[in-house]
């Protein structure tokens, strides 16, 4: 083949295949819950795109799969799980928490209509999404409040909020730990709220952002742009009820205005977190205190936190400009 023919065919091939485009930045979230509202609003409001990022949101239910996705490099950022990230870090992974929008266990213990008192749960089946996850912690907090032992009930893994709600309404579960809007749906179906765990005022990193330290080091600029987009979403959530309710409806499939208003009140007002969504060290201390093993006893909250993105944005005056 002559050199001229070779270059002609090469140019034709390039023109036929078209330009190579970068893969979107994948961001995973761990639940179909209003707790994910900041991320959803940031995406739907176009704030990541405004920062020059092409982003794709992925729902990955359950902390284990989400952790594996981050460690494999498939998903650079995740929103939702805290305990699985801390447990993985205790085992030597380089996962790290870089922000957090919820500092309370925003869950309700919902029971069958005939169960009106916690004592009636003895010997009954109670659902959590994952053993060791935030719903499991919420259940333990409620049991402590009630003066009950875990051994007095049977704890069942459901895998997700929709599955837990379905199990409760079908009678396969006697009670289940649910977050909004699933707890609101349960109440509309005639279920009973045994405990509003959020009212127990337990400091807990309910909806943290996480990544790997290696990604953060290698992609500092991308990480900063991601955090700018995310915090713009948080500001929009807090200040634009109408838009936020539309976004919540899209992702949760809730359509009635009353439930959407409750959902917004919960996550856009009551539990939207601190002005700057730092990870609070005391919230990590709470998890470490309740985690068995020598590694947890010897660990410090700082081992799991990197607030440097938010600190850099704060120092630059970023948060003073939001909302202007």
Task: State what each model feature region is.
Residues 83-84, 162-252:
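Pocket-lining segment of extracytoplasmic ligand-binding domains
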Residues 42, 48, 88, 143, ...:
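Hydrophobic alpha-helix position signal
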Residues 1-5:
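Positively charged n-region of N-terminal signal peptides that target proteins for export
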Residues 6-17:
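Bacterial N-terminal signal peptides
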Residues 288-324:
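Conserved C-terminal helix/tail region of periplasmic/extracytoplasmic solute-binding proteins
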Residues 23-170, 174-180, 193-197, 202-203:
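Short, glycine-/small- and polar/acidic-enriched structural segments
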Residues 75, 79, 169, 267-281, ...:
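Short amphipathic alpha-helical segments at helix boundaries and their inter-helical linkers
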Residues 217-297:
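Secondary-structure end/capping motifs
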């Amino acid at each position: 083949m002559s050199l001229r023919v070779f270059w002609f065919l090469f140019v034709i091939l390039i023109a036929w295949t078209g330009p190579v485009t970068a893969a979107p930045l994948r961001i995973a979230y761990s639940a179909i819950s209003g707790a994910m509202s900041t991320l959803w609003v940031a995406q739907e409001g176009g704030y990541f795109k405004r920062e020059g990022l092409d982003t794709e949101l992925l729902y990955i239910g359950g902390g284990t799969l989400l952790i594996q996705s981050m460690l494999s490099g498939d998903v650079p950022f995740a929103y939702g799980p805290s305990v699985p990230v801390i447990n993985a870090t205790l085992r030597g992974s380089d996962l790290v928490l870089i922000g957090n929008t919820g500092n309370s266990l925003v869950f309700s213990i919902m029971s069958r209509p005939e169960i009106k008192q916690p004592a009636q749960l003895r010997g009954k089946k109670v659902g959590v999404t994952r053993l060791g996850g935030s719903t499991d912690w919420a259940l333990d907090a409620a049991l402590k409040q009630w003066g009950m032992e875990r051994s007095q009930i049977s704890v069942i893994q459901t895998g997700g909020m929709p599955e837990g709600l379905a199990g409760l309404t079908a009678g396969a579960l006697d009670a289940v730990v649910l977050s909004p809007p699933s707890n609101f749906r349960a109440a509309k179906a005639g279920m009973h709220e045994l405990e509003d765990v959020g009212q127990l005022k337990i400091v807990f990193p309910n909806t943290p952002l996480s990544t790997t330290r290696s990604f953060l080091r290698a992609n500092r600029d991308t990480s900063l742009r991601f955090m700018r987009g995310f915090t713009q979403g948080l500001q929009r959530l807090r200040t634009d009820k109408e838009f936020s309710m539309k976004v919540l409806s899209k992702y949760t499939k809730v359509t009635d205005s009353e439930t959407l208003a409750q959902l917004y009140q919960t996550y856009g007002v009551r539990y939207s977190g601190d002005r700057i969504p730092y990870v609070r060290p005391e919230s990590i201390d709470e998890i470490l205190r309740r985690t068995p093993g020598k590694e947890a006893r010897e660990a410090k909250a700082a081992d799991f936190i990197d607030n440097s993105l938010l600190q850099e944005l704060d120092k630059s005056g970023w948060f003073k400009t939001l909302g202007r």
